[in-house]
């Protein structure tokens, strides 16, 4: 097809020829970025026959991800769990973290152990699915002559492996801060041994409150007002025109997600639980949605997309602005401590 011709012909052009084309046809400069992207990866473009073969294998190669998605979002069911008083609580992907945030340690332990015991019952299926994913990644990396699957994964984002390695090294070099935080959490919770089901529950008690979706939207709008009237007007339109699928439902995928489609606008998936964490999730995902909307509005389709390393800047910025707003508004020391500890645990957990 035309796309294959495009990928084969562009790398063959010399830099001088391209410079002349840009000078003779200035409208081509709109496509300079995608052209450079194709040429940058010329060493990994194969013969027409090989490219056709890899293209036809693409749908098959997506099978591990598709299988896991159907299993996890549609077929998997968790049994109810009991709290310290013996009452049953529903366990789903959407309720898992809120249950782990409970002050009832028995409930936290039961939720954690039941969740992973249920997944463990499918360990062989999950292992085989993961193995299939590894094999397809290795196949395409080898086929395109990358030295490793890591090089292949990072190439599209133009992030050197050295940057990836330095991030890991930086985390390891600063683990002493994490150890201090974990020790503080264990001491404040008053437990002899800190378990994974203890790392979500607030260590400043009696501060968490129910925050409705309407309240959360209003607070997020206030917090992001510093970004200007144009931004908040479009954000309000996104709320009012139902860009968001808000509440959990049977068969709905867990977590939160923002689609980056250009028309008519991005769509945001949430699993609202009416708490502070959900409020931050709204700010985070609408950061993605606004980024996509504004990028598509002000740039041509060929340059409007962005890589994950850039995407998380917009979403994390919104979270930071929301945290700043909440801290500035609060005068209660306990509430401020709760907010700071929440953000510390979120950073450690990497919920983004």
Language model features by range: what are they?
Residues 292-313:
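Post-HEXXH active-site segment of zinc metalloproteases
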Residues 281, 285, 289:
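Catalytic glutamate of the conserved HExxH
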Residues 327-345:
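Long, amphipathic alpha-helical stalk/connector segments used for oligomerization, subunit docking
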Residues 306-333:
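Post-HExxH zinc-binding segment in Zn-dependent metallohydrolases
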Residues 269-282:
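Short pre-active-site segment immediately N-terminal to the catalytic Zn-binding motif
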Residues 2-9, 343-348, 352:
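Conserved small/polar residues in nucleotide/adenosyl-binding loops
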Residues 1-206, 217:
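A well-structured
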Residues 207-262, 275-276:
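Auxiliary, metal-adjacent structural segments of Zn-dependent hydrolase domains
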């Amino acid at each position: 097809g035309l796309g294959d011709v495009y990928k084969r012909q562009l790398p063959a052009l010399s830099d001088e020829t391209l410079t002349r084309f840009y000078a003779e046809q200035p409208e081509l400069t709109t496509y300079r970025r995608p052209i450079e992207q194709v040429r940058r990866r010329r060493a990994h473009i194969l013969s027409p026959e090989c490219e056709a073969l890899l293209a036809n294998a693409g749908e098959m190669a997506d099978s591990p991800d598709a299988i896991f998605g159907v299993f996890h979002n549609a077929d998997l069911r968790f049994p109810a769990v009991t709290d310290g008083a013996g009452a049953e609580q529903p366990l789903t992907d959407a309720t898992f973290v809120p249950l782990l945030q409970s002050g009832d340690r028995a409930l936290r332990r039961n939720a954690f152990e039941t969740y992973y015991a249920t997944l463990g019952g499918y360990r062989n299926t999950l292992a085989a699915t993961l193995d299939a994913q590894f094999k397809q990644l290795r196949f395409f990396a080898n086929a395109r002559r990358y030295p490793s699957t890591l090089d292949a994964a990072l190439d599209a984002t133009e992030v050197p492996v050295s940057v990836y390695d330095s991030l890991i090294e930086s985390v390891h070099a600063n683990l002493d801060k994490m150890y201090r935080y974990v020790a503080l959490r264990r001491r404040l919770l008053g437990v002899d041994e800190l378990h994974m089901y203890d790392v979500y529950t607030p260590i400043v008690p009696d501060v968490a409150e129910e925050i409705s979706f309407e309240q959360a939207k209003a607070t997020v709008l206030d917090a992001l007002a510093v970004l200007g009237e144009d931004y908040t007007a479009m954000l309000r339109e996104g709320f009012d025109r139902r860009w968001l699928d808000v509440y959990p439902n049977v068969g709905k995928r867990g977590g939160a997600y923002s689609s980056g489609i250009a028309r008519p606008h991005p769509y945001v998936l949430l699993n609202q639980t009416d708490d502070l964490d959900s409020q931050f999730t709204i700010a985070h995902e609408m950061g993605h949605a606004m980024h996509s909307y504004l990028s598509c509005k002000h740039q041509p389709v060929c340059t409007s997309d962005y890589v994950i390393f850039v995407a998380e800047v917009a979403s994390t910025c919104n979270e930071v602005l929301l945290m700043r707003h909440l801290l500035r508004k609060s005068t209660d020391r306990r509430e401020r401590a709760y907010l700071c500890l929440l953000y510390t645990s979120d950073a450690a957990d990497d919920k983004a």
